[in-house]
Design a protein with these regions (language model features):
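N-terminal binding-site loop/beta-alpha segment at the start of enzyme catalytic domains
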Residues: 1-84, 99, 112
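Generic structural signal for short, solvent-exposed loop/turn connectors between secondary structure elements
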Residues: 62, 89-100, 148
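Short, contiguous strand/loop micro-motifs
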Residues: 28-30, 89, 142
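Feature marks short, surface-exposed loop/turn motifs that line or immediately flank catalytic pockets
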Residues: 30-33, 60, 92-94, 120-125
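Short, surface-exposed alpha-helical recognition segments that flank or form part
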Residues: 34, 57, 93, 143-147
Length: 149
C-alpha cells in the first residue's frame, strides 16, 4: 500500500489575510540540475502523496510544465484547485512589470489565481545567458516599494 502524508497533520500558518498556508511544501527550483520534465514528475508525485503547497517561480523556467501537471492532477481528481496553495515570484528583471510578470505566471501555470506572489529577490539584476550567477548589471539598485511598485 502506498503511503501518503497525513494532510491534517501538516502544520499550517495563518497569513495576515486569515488564509492558511501549509508550513511544508514542495519547491520547484531544480532547473540547474534537473529537467523541467523531472521537476514535473516530482510535482505530480508530491501532490499525489499529500503535498498541498507548491512553490514556483518564473525564473525556474518550468512553470509551463508545472501548469500541465496541475491540469493533470485536477483532471485525474487527485486534488481540486482549492486544496492547493500555489506560490510564485517576480524575478529581478521584472520589478517594474510586476503585473505583467504575474499574468505570465498565471498563464504558464494555467491558473486564474496564485495564492501568494513574492518578490523573489529584492535587487534588480540582469543575467545574460551563460553568465556567472554573481554577475550584476552595473545599473542595478536595491529594491524599494516606492521605486518599483
Amino acid at each position: 500500500m502506498e503511503k501518503q502524508i497525513e494532510i491534517l497533520n501538516v502544520p499550517k500558518r495563518v497569513l495576515f489575510t486569515g488564509e492558511e498556508i501549509p508550513a511544508v511544501g514542495l519547491g520547484t527550483f531544480g532547473s540547474d540540475k534537473y529537467s523541467a520534465e523531472q521537476v514535473s514528475e516530482a510535482v505530480y508525485g508530491a501532490i499525489k502523496y499529500g503535498y498541498r503547497l507548491v512553490d514556483c517561480a518564473a525564473v525556474y523556467q518550468n512553470e509551463k510544465q508545472i501548469g500541465e501537471v496541475l491540469k493533470k492532477v485536477f483532471q485525474d481528481k487527485v486534488v481540486t484547485r482549492e486544496e492547493l496553495f500555489i506560490t510564485s515570484k517576480v524575478w529581478n528583471d521584472r520589478h517594474r512589470e510586476v503585473e505583467a510578470a504575474c499574468r505570465q505566471s498565471l498563464e504558464d501555470l494555467g491558473l486564474s489565481t496564485i495564492d501568494l506572489y513574492f518578490v523573489h529577490w529584492p535587487f534588480p539584476n540582469y543575467h545574460a545567458p551563460g553568465c556567472g550567477g554573481d554577475s550584476r548589471n552595473p545599473d542595478s539598485k536595491p529594491f524599494s516599494v516606492e521605486e518599483f511598485m
